[in-house]
Structure formats: structure tokens, C-alpha cells
Amino acid sequence: MRMLYRPTATKLPILRAVALLKDRHGVIDIQLPISGSLDDPQFSVGGLIGGVIANLLTKAVTAPFALLASAFGGGEELSTLSFAPGSASIAADAKKRIDTLGKALADRPALKLDIGGRADPATDREVLRRASVDTAVRDEKMKSLVAAGNAPASVDEVTVNSEERNRWLTEAYRSAALPERPRNALGMLKDVPPAEMEAMLLADAKIDDDALRQLANRRAQAVKDAIVATGVESERLFLIAPRLGNEAGGVEGATGEAPGVPARVDLALR
């Protein structure tokens, strides 16, 4: 059954539901599970239509992403996208959800999307601390490559294999302004095991909440860029203030409740 949308609704929930159901041609396509005999005096198409529409409107308001997923061939939850600790790279399963979401937004031009990143103070902070130490190690090798005249364009392109890591770890340890490095009677640095050097560098690597929020923002921006790549206009996508852990706020309509998965991006439809 097809119904042409007429702009007579005035209540916001109805308008949001219509935006969710109306396709790019201005048509709302509703499937009616009709069975029975027209000769049956108890048979009522009107009642059936009313019930289906009421159910759709309710679902459009209370579970909009579930409705989109069912309409566009995605069985996954579309309202959250999880990330690996410390990473802003979109995983393969999240990319599939974004592709489904891109199809849905392309066919529902009245919809807009809020995108809010989250970072986990526990797991993300630990990974970022280790990444900070790894960067310091690569920096030391980069200095050597610069001196030799064959440095890459960026330290991100420098690789340190397991055989040479202790060498550059030692250089990073000696270059760092660590407060309590073991020294001998002459005040010179003592040789310490690599594990101890790394532990001191990790302890000195300070990852504050601002760094975590920057990571959350990078996640949100990565999701926005991926959705834009599907063909959705950037003007329909809005970045929301980042949040840490499961703290409330951010994307309106997101519960902030995803135990064990606070490293994510929350999505909400407007």
C-alpha cells in the first residue's frame, strides 16, 4: 500500500516519524499483512490500517534505527559504532553499518544525524600511553635517519622491529626528562633492563582527559567522513560534544549505557 505524504501533521513525534518513513519520492510505503475474506462481517481494513500505522509511528519514535535497519537490509544496531581501544579507525563491521546507514539517509532526505564520540578513560588511556612511548622510540630512530640523510617524511612512517627496539628504547629513556632515573655515584645514568625503562616511560606518559576527548572527536569525525563518502550531504551530519566513558549527555536520545563498550560513537536522528 502506498500513501502520499500531506503536510498536515503538527506534532513533533509525528513529523519525525514521517521523516523516517517518507522516501526521497515523497512516498510512504507500508506493507499490510491482510488475510481473511471480504465477505466476513468482522473483516475491517480500516482497523488493520490504523493498527499498522500506529505501530509504525510508535516504532519510528521509540526505535528509529531498528526501523531503518529492517527497511534497508541491516540486522545490526545502527545507533552505536564501537572502536578498538586507542583507535579512531573504523572497523569492518562498523563500515557495514555505515553503508546501511548511508543507504537509509540517501532514501530519507528529511533526516539529519547527530554524531557524538566517546572515549574510555580506562582502556583508551592505557593504549594512548603505550602509543606515546612507541612514538618516543620512533622519534629516536627518526633522529638517526635524519642524520644519515634518509629519513621518511613523517615519524609515523618510521618502523622499529623487535631486534632494534631495545636500542631505540634506551635512547628514548636517556632523552626523556624522567624525574627519578637510577644514577651511579658520579651522577651518571645507570644501565637498567628494557622492561624497567619502558615502565618508567609509561609512568611518565600523561594522557589527560583533553587527549581522550580529542580521540573521541577523531572517532566522530571518522564516522562523519565515512557517511559522507556514501553520498550523504555533510550539512545533514552534526558533530556533538565528546563524552568520556558512560557519562550522560552528548547525543540527544542516546542512553549512554553500553557496559563494557564506552569506546564508541553514538548516533541519533533529528
Residue ranges and their predicted role:
Residues 1-261, 267-270:
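Extended terminal
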